[in-house]
């Protein structure tokens, strides 16, 4: 259903732009169009739903981040990852092997400009100073990363022209730094101080990893949003425009 609008019937007009929002940890009953008694007002989503399609009998083969994203990006069943959990820290390599067609890559083939802003979470390969792939979780793995090296299986090598985001969950996993394209322009320099973070039931979900200067836990989703809005603004100003596919991937 997501791809159908991109394949116009013979004689149809221009290819449509596509905005795909992956709302991590959004419950079925959290949106007003599905649950009038929802505690969170969602007027914009409700308006979109009124003009589109409501899925009332949809089922997920996986309820966690990594397998879900793998399925969305590849069109394959989540069980094919062989992984029921999620990547953390410098975990990798990318589950989407080189040469596998992705949603972004397919749309690139149709002339789309493709962008992904937000959480990737299907693995990336980081290297140490000797050029050895790390592909492990934990603080020591993050400490070993050589940040001068490019990431060979970042999203820009898997079907996306633009990427800004995080390798894993940006507020709970060991590597608290942003990736721009296939590099980390501002590497982490110290251990995260969890003291100033808001106190709630999941306060200790933040693993004691390495954090980059200026990396604000409270502003993560807003930074992803700024990148998506800037991409849309830049696209609107172009005189010669290809259609765009924007994958906005929120954090958990």
Outline where the language-model segments fall:
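Bacterial N-terminal signal peptides
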Residues: 1-5
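Formylglycine-dependent sulfatase
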Residues: 7-252
């Amino acid at each position: 259903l997501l791809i159908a609008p991109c394949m116009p019937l013979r004689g149809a007009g221009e290819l449509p732009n596509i905005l795909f929002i992956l709302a991590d940890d959004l419950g079925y009953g959290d949106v007003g169009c599905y649950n009038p008694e929802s505690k969170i007002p969602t007027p914009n989503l409700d308006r979109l739903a009124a003009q589109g399609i409501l899925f009332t009998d949809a089922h997920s083969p996986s309820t966690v981040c990594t397998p879900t994203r793998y399925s969305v990006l590849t069109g394959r069943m989540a069980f094919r990852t062989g992984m029921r959990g999620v990547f953390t820290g410098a975990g990798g390599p990318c589950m989407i092997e080189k040469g596998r067609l992705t949603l972004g890559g397919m749309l690139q083939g149709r002339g789309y400009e493709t962008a992904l802003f937000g959480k990737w979470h299907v693995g990336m390969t980081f290297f140490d100073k000797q050029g050895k792939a790390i592909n492990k979780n934990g603080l020591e793995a993050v400490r070993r990363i050589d940040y001068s090296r490019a990431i060979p299986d970042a999203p820009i090598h898997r079907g996306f022209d633009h990427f800004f985001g995080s390798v894993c969950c940006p507020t709970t996993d060991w590597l608290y730094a942003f990736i721009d394209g296939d590099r980390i322009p501002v590497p982490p320099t110290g251990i995260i101080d969890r003291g100033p973070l808001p106190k709630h039931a999941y306060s200790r979900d933040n693993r004691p990893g390495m954090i980059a200067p200026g990396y604000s836990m409270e502003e993560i989703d807003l930074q992803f949003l700024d990148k998506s809005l800037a991409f849309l603004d830049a696209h609107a100003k172009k005189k010669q425009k290809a259609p765009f596919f924007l994958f906005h991937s929120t954090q958990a």
